[in-house]
Amino acid sequence: MVSAPSGAGKSTLVNVVLARDARLKLSVSYTTRAPRAGEVDGREYHFVDAGTFQAMADRGDFLESARVHGNLYGTSRRWIEGIQAQNLDIILEIDWQGARQMRRIFPGAVTIFIFPPSLPELERRLRSRGKDTEIGRAHV
């Protein structure tokens, strides 16, 4: 599991690691967040509306789920179980709430927390993403 505040560099690090080892599979989370420019449904996230997400949660489709900055995120139980059945390793790019839930389910999982280079750099990254809002500043 790789966890970090928004803008710390999780995705960059995960993409480098995935490019080096084809045996690693990235879990693509479900979210109610709107896609950012350049994001593709099913690649960065599975983008769903709140009603669909809640129905999935009610059915037990998620191993973990969390509300982060007003949006819902969840990890697919079926996908994780399918990859485990193939004896492949999984990378979860996940927030601290999800990481805590997953550690309870998989206590032997390796957890990596990434810190941003500095608070000013983190703020710069968040502003460049268009997160120059109260929520964006709350990250810092």
Positions of the model-derived regions?
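The feature captures the helix immediately C-terminal to the Walker
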Residues: 14-15
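Conserved phosphate-donor/acceptor-positioning beta-strand/loop module used by diverse small-molecule
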Residues: 90-95, 105-127
